[in-house]
């Protein structure tokens, strides 16, 4: 009898074939089910508590999947899909995960009919490509040539409202103010493109949070805000027509890299040593004054003696500014970052109409307005507590991304599940023209798309199945813009009339992220998991749950 061959390390578990596939599908479906209730304007929040006890309350899909510390490898594929969605378009993360889960659920039914995973994957790819082809035909191109026109602003307002309505804690006048701020910020930094759209660099829009007041106290600053204060009481608090030196060099005597000692034998030598140090710092300040600087913003420290000399020269100074802020200042002010003060020239200076220290709540902040490059803006958020501010920041980021997407590709689609239903109907027609078992996979893709309006109907308080049947019937009659008005709790024939719209770029990316994640999981037929480290075993974590366990068992998503 031949000796056994040990191929894998002792303790390694292996699940193969349909067991591995079903295990992975179950893990992905479980994650999608967790996010399901967070979809749409009336989506519910999740309370996430990390290992340090910090609490996050949010219904933002990207934040939920990032903070959940998911362990199952298949569920991690959905997390990566959500991250890709967030990085690419900044919105639609919950939709992408929910749709991927629905695609896998429908695929599981096909697997039960003994349809090979390869056929399902090919069918899904054909359905995805057909959906991408149909989207521009079902959308409406909008005119945004003049961003300051009432027509363009009205369209941008509708997009921002659709995004913020599902997330933002504000309503009424507060919500309107936030929408206006977001639109003003985007319009301010938009650069025209040859195709009629606009390029928007979101790096030029900075968001700062300051506890105190209410959301309505938030302001948009056409310039930048530094969460710092002027370093010396003798310095001016307000400088107009500011010539600004942006430094990443320290205004202090730096310690030598090698250890050194000095031998002092008399008090005069101490005085001479200190005088030389003061002269060194004074020379640096004199150099900055000689090139015309009346404001100094430093990434590193500013010595007390240097502060004194700067104050005597009437120069406003701020120290220990974040590197990211220094880089934004370089762009906004038209400055060059000064690394060597002795080599600084007047051409290195940036310009702003006003630099002023102001009190915000209990703190002081430095406002830089009227910058040379007026495209840099700063949104200063106010709120009653840190959790509200964090959620407001996430919401505004999503709205900024949504507006950027519509400016890059100015085509809008009907929201409220209308586009998914219309795509599903068209894909079923397309499936009939495709021969073989792939037809079933395309129909399954269409069924999965209907999961979105189904969930929206549920969150609106409607009876889900009867609502879906009603929506299908209306779309069959040619009412292609029929969707769910979640806020009103009813089905409407024209979601455009209620400003329920979505950018085509977001929807295209949702389809791409969900299809790629689902097909990647369907391709896996072998799950090989190494034994956990001994320290993990001592912690009581079994290897079977870590690796997905035996085929058909419930996978563990988290720790």
Swiss-Prot record:
Query: Where does this protein have compositionally biased stretches of type Basic and acidic residues?
Result: 535-547
Q: Where is the signal peptide?
A: none
GO molecular function terms noted in the UniProt entry: ATP binding; ATP hydrolysis activity; ATP-dependent protein folding chaperone; unfolded protein binding
GO BP annotations, alphabetical order: protein folding
Which Pfam family is one of those matched by this entry?
Answer: Cpn60_TCP1
| Matches recorded under Gene3D superfamilies | GroEL (3.50.7.10), GroEL-like equatorial domain (1.10.560.10), TCP-1-like chaperonin intermediate domain (3.30.260.10)
Q: Could you list this entry's UniProt keywords, alphabetically sorted.
A: ATP-binding, Chaperone, Nucleotide-binding
Q: Where is this region: Disordered?
A: 535-559
**Would the keyword Glycoprotein be found if you checked this record's keyword annotation?**
no
- What does this protein do, in the record's words? Molecular chaperone; binds unfolded polypeptides in vitro, and has a weak ATPase activity.
State the family it belongs to. Belongs to the TCP-1 chaperonin family.
| Record note on quaternary structure | Forms a Heterooligomeric complex of two stacked eight-membered rings.
UniProt name for this protein: Thermosome subunit alpha
Q: Which organism is it from?
A: Saccharolobus solfataricus (strain ATCC 35092 / DSM 1617 / JCM 11322 / P2)
Q: Gene for this protein? A: thsA
